[in-house]
Amino acid sequence: MASDLEGKAVLITGASTGIGAAAARAFARLGSRVAVHYNTSRDAAEKVAADVRALGGEASLVGGDVTDGSVIKRIVAETLNAFGRIDVLINNAGGLVARTRIEDYSEAFLQKVLALNVIHVALFMREVIPVMRRQKKGNVINVSSIAARHGGGAGAIIYAGAKGFISTATHGWAKEVVGDGIRVNAVSPGVITTPFHERYSTPEQLKGMQATIPMNRLGTADECAGTFVYLASDDLSGYVTGQVIEVNGGQYMP
């Protein structure tokens, strides 16, 4: 199953912790070559890279702030230098920045949320799609959020809107590049136990979220990882493009 991913070059942004790290390990088990991106958490990224190698994959570290377009160019160049190609791009980096009420919005805050969750994804597309076009094949997997479905809680509305953009743009990008042998999909995680919620959600908030989930528990990063493998594998999902796959324990159903 997913044996076609052996040797494939996979660039994962935000791969030092959480869902990105779990995805890196999942691809490693299949023999993929993984570019593990980090911003400030180099030690954590080095641990993930060591895990990738121990699990049977190859690993390369790529670091930098994805809100800087010149850094994105360098990350892509370093990945190509390490692996010679990019078969799978996973746009996982992102963040809430801060829970901010409407009356406290500043231009700097709004720009930071959009840079971290929208603009850098478009810039990675700009840099990687030409590479995949030359290869005549490739897979892009964006990361949306359940917040795109319900608009986010208090203080998280701009983040939710940014993730709504990712879901919508995934449909459009998929149509634009389908003729080039490139598939574009998205994974939309629900409430997952990662550093994201450790930072931005209180235990009381998480308890309230859990009460709305039919499975009556929060998800794990490892439970998201299989969806990335599925979407990256042409053997498993070769006829799937332009889709947003929900991984949320049944909290929201189409």
Language model features by range: what are they?
Residues 4, 218-247, 252:
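C-terminal substrate-recognition "lid" of short-chain dehydrogenase/reductases
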